[in-house]
Amino acid sequence: QDCAMIDYKGGGGGWGYSFKLAYAQRCLVQRCYSREGRHPFVANGRAWGPNVFVDCYATESKNETGSHMKYATGLLYDNVKVKAEKFPGDYGLVVRNRGPFYEHGQMGGQNVFWNCVSLKYNSIPGRIVCETPAHAMNFAIGCKGLRENGTDCNYFNSYNGPDGIYD
């Protein structure tokens, strides 16, 4: 909690993941900040949950925040704000099926985005993708951003009190 990862410099691959949960269960990441992270707040590689990212903020994000690369369950993104890098990237808050793209496939089930915000540079609304697989549910509740087709949402682009589920 109360950590920052600022201006990471390095190559691709697994580098630049600001706050990553892998093989994780019952973890709380709270009030953390990322600047120029490749994947600011992610769970990948069999994060079985419950796991929570609460009151976290990312600026100049270089890629998606959400479950990433293999299946993650029981994730709560509570009042997380992500702002993309200055170049026109298609990033934001994401849980989806990435198909045969490398080893990614379906990235998660039983995940919730609660009162989260996705922005592109210049405060243009950013993308939120919250696909639901056949065997589980994912939710985006009270979030602000661009709702991508196939996204299961409740009260999208509106405040949904309380500020956070976790508080």
Where are the predicted features?
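Short, tandemly repeated low-complexity microdomains enriched for cysteine and small residues
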Residues: P88-V95, I124-G126
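Metal-dependent DNA phosphodiester-chemistry modules and their immediately adjacent helices/loops
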Residues: G66-H68
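Right-handed parallel beta-helix
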Residues: Q1-K9, Y23-H39, A47-K62, Y71-K86, ...
